[in-house]
Regions:
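Metalloprotease/metallohydrolase-associated module, dominated by Zn2+-dependent proteases
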Residues: 2-73, 90-152
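Active-site recognition of the HExxH zinc-binding catalytic motif
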Residues: 77-90
Length: 152
């Protein structure tokens, strides 16, 4: 469902059913239907990460921040980015502490060549966070680092 933010930009209110539909659609369209199921969670991000993939649980999870004004293009790009993580982890069986390594980039290049998709390696430059000021760079990077080294 499209709404407009205070700047008049159309955005999408995240719904789990819509994200699950997108997962199935993008899986068929871009990954030839090979991705196994993945839990999708809509959460409030407190560290300015718009989305992330958690491979540490039995059934991996994709988390999407609800406190973002998601445009259609941003949502598609970021969601497919997280699906690439799922592909690398579950299909290619690549197990690494570092998430945006050569294998990840190789899959992104394949998607660009085959489908014309541009998947950014790092957080998509989202400018529409809902009523929050941006934390300092040091705080932001510290939170990201701790997320990777601490067990969940």
């Amino acid at each position: 469902m499209a709404r407009k933010n205070k700047d008049g930009v159309k955005y999408i209110a995240l719904k789990k059913a819509d994200l699950e539909r997108r997962f199935k659609e993008y899986n068929e369209m871009y990954f030839d239907g090979v991705l196994p199921p993945c839990n999708i969670r809509i959460v409030k991000s407190t560290n300015r990460i718009a989305a992330w993939y958690n491979f540490r649980s039995k059934v991996p999870k994709i988390y999407m921040a609800r406190n973002v004004y998601w445009t259609e293009d941003d949502l598609k790009s970021v969601f497919i980015h997280e699906m690439v993580h799922h592909y690398v982890w579950k299909i290619l069986k690549y197990d690494s502490f570092f998430s945006h390594v050569r294998t990840f980039r190789k899959v992104c290049r394949m998607l660009r060549k085959k489908h014309g998709l541009r998947v950014n390696l790092w957080e998509y430059p989202l400018s529409h966070w809902k009523g929050e000021k941006k934390p300092s760079f040091l705080k932001d990077m510290t939170v990201r680092f701790l997320y990777w080294i601490l067990p969940l």
